[in-house]
Every structure is written in C-alpha cells, then in structure tokens.
C-alpha cells in the first residue's frame, strides 16, 4: 500500500513538473489587464473573468506541454541544455502518456473557452461567438505549433512574434472585447505594452539556450544574435513596453508628468546592462 501511495505521489509530482505551473502568471497578466480596462469603463463581470482566467491558464499549460514534447521529439532537450531538464527528456513521463495528457488539456481548453465565449455574448450574438471560437482555435494551434511539427515556428525565429500577438494583443484587446462587446484602438497600446515583455521572457530563455539550440538546428532569434545584441534586444523590449504604457496613460488620463521620472529610469538602463 505504501509503495502504491509513493508511486501516486511521484506521478502527481511528475505531472506538476511537466505542466510548469510557475509560468502561469505570464498568462494571467493579459486576463488581469483586460479586466482592468473593462472595469475602467464600468463593464467588469466576474463570470467572464473567472472563465478567462482558466482559459488562459489552460492555454499556457498546453503551450508548455507542446514545447516539452516538440523539443523532445526533435532531440533539442539533450544533455547540453542549460536550464532544468523537461519531464519527457528526464524520463519522468512516458511519451504516449504525455500525448494523452496533451489531448485532455486541449479538450479542457476548448470546453472552457466555449463557455467563456457563450457567457460573454450568448447565442444571439452568433457572429461574435463564431469570431472568438475561430480566434480560440488559432490560440490552440499556435500553442501546439511552437515546437511541434515540421514547420514549428519556434524553430525558425518567429516565437517572439507569436508571443507578442497572443500574450499581448489578443489577450488584452480580445479579452476586453469579451467584456465590452465593442472595439477601441487605444487598447492596442496596453496590449503591445504587455506583449513586449512577454516576448522578453521567451527571448531571455532562448538566450540561455542559444548555444545548444544552434547545435540542434533550432534557429531562434537569440541563436541568430550575439550575446550583446541579444541583451540589447531584451532591453529594447522592456523600454518599448514602458514607453507604450506611458503613451496610453497620457492619451487616456493625461498623465504627462509621468514622463520625467520614467525618462530618468530609461537613461539608467544602459548603465545597468554595462554593470
């Protein structure tokens, strides 16, 4: 009996490790920002927030699992990898079992996503329902195709672009639309401001793995750059996010006085990188 309990605990620990739950806050950021934008115009709804929260979490988990599986199949997660070993590469979960787990997460994502769209619009707004179902399908495909398949976009340097689109623009603009049912071009500013540092998270990981990725034919943006240019690009993403957020604050709330202290912070960034 004790052996069975120990095995169950080991299985749970292996799956928790495979899901990479520590990355979930990255998916929550877009949900929280969309909720804040909706609340600022008085249309926040808890039901939409909760369903959006779980949909974003499941998409992040699916992306993590697909990344693990794709790199394992292509042999990228070898001994040369600097970061922590993934669940498949370490042998903690069998490949067939892992694929079944991905399928379950995919079904859960579709179910919760459908509930989110119907809660936001109902069946009467069938045009919006179909639009967001198509958008949701695109999110699922993008989550899987990062490293899975012969044309995985993560292996051709497009990872940061897709993260910018889906973790930034789609999460914030699409999420806010689910609350309001209307479009505002100003949402592109906070959406892009979130998308840039989200891309920075991926870029920083790829900088860490650049040497191993080059050896395994994974042509990420970081593997095509020198370390110096990679760090400069990382700083550009962060600075760009700050500038876009300031522009949005000024356009929406006329908070021009924020520019001065922020400019002083930006001046110090090159010094910080040199140190």
Language-model segment annotations:
Residues 1-51, 55, 150-153, 163:
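Topogenic membrane-insertion module of multi-pass membrane proteins
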Residues 250-275:
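Extended hydrophobic alpha-helices typical of membrane-associated regions
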Residues 25, 29-33, 161-176, 223-227:
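Small-residue-rich segments of transmembrane alpha-helices in multi-pass membrane proteins
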Residues 84-182:
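Intramembrane alpha-helical segments
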Residues 66-108, 195-240:
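Solvent-exposed interhelical
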Residues 16, 24-28, 46-54, 99-103, ...:
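Hydrophobic alpha-helical transmembrane segments
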Residues 33, 41-66, 131-144, 184-204:
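Membrane-embedded alpha-helical segments that form the functional core of polytopic membrane enzymes
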Residues 64-67, 87, 141-154, 202, ...:
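C-terminal ends of transmembrane helices
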